[in-house]
Amino acid sequence: VGKLIDHGVLPASIAWIDPEFTAGDLGAKWRAVPSNTSVKLFINYLTGADSFRFAHAPHFALNDLAPTDTCLLGDVADPLVWITGQLCAQVSALRTRATGLALHGGRWEVQTELGEITSKNVILAVGSVPKKLAYPWLNEIPIEVALDPAKLAEQPLEGATVAVFGASHSSMIALPNLLAGPAAKVINFYRGPLRYAVDMGEWTLFDDTGLKGEAARWARENIDGVLPDRLQRCLVDSPEFPELLESCDYAVYTVGFSPRPIPAAPQWGQLECNAANGIIAPGLFGVGIAFPEYRIDPTGFGEYRVGLQKFMDRLNKTLPLWLKYGS
């Protein structure tokens, strides 16, 4: 929304649809989670659009943190909520959900819970949801609970054995959180070796798939170093996997995220987003964690770019194209 305004789109012609306007899942679910992004990059994002008016923002805790440090996502959510308020005051903010899309007469018809609106262009930033595995006999601890020490402390885990699936940033936060509680045992089921991000100066090796910050530090000491008491690791392809899985009472799935379904578009069937430029259809575009950019690094390794500043970088490159590739 901010970048559209910065590119000269009249605020009065922008309809922003969101059920809450509280900085999405980041503001609602992930505030207690340590980031894998430096404070400096968050500040770059917050100051990256004139329409954000961040120069006029009140003082936030984020302003007091060292630029090269990581932080809690809650430190970022607070200024994002403030910016949301600034943008909502400029555009038509509709507190609802989009449920359907159709293209007629060169304009997109967007069905919402409040009725229909039409537009020449539609940008989807629908977000993603955690993936799950099919072990229904295990009591699931939602990932947003496992990553929040206060919420996790409310779980009745005394004497329990907890399975943690995955070896991601989220995994390396959930594991120490669980080990700090009363669980009798924690078993980490994994598929391969850990991957760490390495700053190479002008680029970062494994920038989007490697461990960073506190998660990387903990993993080096406790996974690739000396396993803590009560923590066991098991390769999912090993013969021990079925028996160890059967011994578990609870499960935490830290195995990635899937894009939320986009509004139904029976006219087109299954729509796909071009990972190179964000185009879904003429006048229909995708941005954010549900539609990340795919980039190949100098070594030839490719990964999807996920992070607020990376979404901003993507918009800076693609928005001029989108504004010409209308319906």
Across the structure, where does each feature detected by a protein language model lie?
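Dinucleotide-binding Rossmann-like beta1-alpha1 core, especially the glycine-rich loop
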Residues: R31-W82
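Conserved N-terminal glycine-rich FAD pyrophosphate-binding loop of Rossmann-like flavoproteins
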Residues: P19-T47, A197-T209
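Flavin (primarily FAD) cofactor-binding/catalytic cores of flavoenzymes
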Residues: G2-F21, L62-S327
